[in-house]
């Protein structure tokens, strides 16, 4: 296990988003100088105590100017589903250009879309990528751009994790789907309850990013690390929710066939069904390589992470 390295200044692109805010808070707590780049209308959602830079991320030159002097740039920009094909690659190019101009290390949050419907049960840094969805293909294209930039001297760290939950704000499978009907005593799970699914508690991912950033000089120019979070069955996940709320729930399931039919006219449903295999295909991330670099991977116990996540959503436990 390597010891801590240099700190410095980090600019978080998308600092008002769920990952951006969690990462900004983690870096600030670790003693970094943190700037949160946000749209003006979302400045109030950025991490308190960080420098707020109001910039439209679609303005590449403004982003490059805002990141001047950064040691690390985190691309935490959250592209809405409907705008993914139009904006994801240009925004990634902007982040690459900004980091290159500042000679900063670029950190990018990878996910599991890259591996497609034939993904294996165990995923590590050597697993071949065969995307079967539009989003997966775009993710591979983005990572290819970053790898090419690394060949030209840009240091890049991809932290690959499962589905995020926790943190401030909304936008995860947990709040949008699973606990949407919790007040009525119902949970909706997206897949078979006995299938293992990889989850990542946002605070833990943010802590891992800090530790990698502090060891950045010791990594390869293009480093991809798998973050092993909570690989649990749906049954284990909903049981943790029940324990947190001290009650049982009726379990419903996402009607994927209906959503697929509706996807013909509702683009967001089409995008969701494209990655529905993530809920029916058992999978887990192998975190051995990340452990070699930072030691024990940050992993808040599932019950505690679920309880904190529900509290952040304003959902109180009984008693």
Task: Give the location of each predicted region.
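NAD(P)-dependent short-chain dehydrogenase/reductase
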Residues: 152, 162-196, 241
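Mid/C-terminal beta-alpha module of Rossmann-like enzyme folds, strongest
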Residues: 2-10, 17, 211-272, 287, ...
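Short-chain dehydrogenase/reductase
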Residues: 85-89, 128, 132-144, 172-176, ...
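NAD(P)H-binding glycine-rich loop region in Rossmannoid oxidoreductase-like domains
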Residues: 41-102
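N-terminal Rossmann NAD(P)H-binding glycine-rich loop of SDR-like oxidoreductase domains
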Residues: 8-30
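Substrate-positioning beta->alpha
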Residues: 170-176, 191-213, 222-223
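Conserved beta-loop-beta element that borders a ligand/cofactor-binding pocket
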Residues: 111, 144-168
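Conserved Rossmann-fold NAD(P)-dependent oxidoreductase catalytic core, especially the SDR/UDP-sugar
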Residues: 93-141, 157
């Amino acid at each position: 296990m390597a010891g801590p390295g240099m700190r410095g200044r980090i600019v978080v692109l998308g600092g008002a988003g769920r990952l951006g805010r969690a990462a900004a808070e983690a870096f600030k707590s670790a003693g970094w100088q943190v700037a949160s780049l946000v749209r003006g209308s979302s400045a109030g959602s950025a991490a308190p105590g960080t420098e707020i830079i109001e910039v439209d991320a679609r303005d590449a030159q403004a982003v490059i100017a805002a990141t001047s002097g950064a040691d690390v740039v985190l691309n935490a920009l959250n592209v809405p589903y409907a705008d993914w094909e139009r904006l994801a690659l240009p925004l990634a190019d902007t982040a690459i250009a900004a980091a290159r101009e500042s000679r900063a290390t670029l950190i990018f949050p990878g996910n599991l879309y890259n591996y497609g419907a034939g993904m294996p049960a165990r995923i590590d840094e050597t697993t071949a990528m065969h995307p079967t969805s539009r989003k997966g293909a775009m993710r591979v294209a983005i990572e290819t751009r970053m790898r090419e930039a690394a060949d030209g001297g840009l240091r890049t760290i991809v932290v690959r994790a499962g589905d995020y939950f926790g943190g401030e704000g909304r936008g995860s499978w947990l709040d949008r789907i699973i606990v949407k009907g919790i007040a009525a005593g119902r949970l909706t799970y997206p897949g078979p309850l006995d299938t293992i699914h990889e989850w990542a508690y946002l605070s833990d991912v943010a802590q891992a990013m800090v530790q990698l950033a502090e060891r950045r000089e010791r990594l390869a120019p293009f480093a991809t690390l798998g973050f092993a979070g909570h690989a649990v069955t749906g049954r284990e996940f909903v049981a943790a929710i029940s324990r947190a709320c001290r009650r049982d729930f009726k379990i419903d399931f996402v009607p994927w066939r209906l959503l697929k039919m509706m996807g013909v006219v509702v683009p967001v449903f089409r995008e969701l069904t494209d990655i529905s295999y993530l809920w029916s295909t058992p999978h887990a991330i192998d975190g051995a390589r990340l452990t070699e670099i930072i030691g024990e991977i940050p992993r808040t116990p599932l019950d505690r992470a679920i309880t904190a996540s529900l509290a952040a959503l304003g959902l109180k436990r009984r008693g």
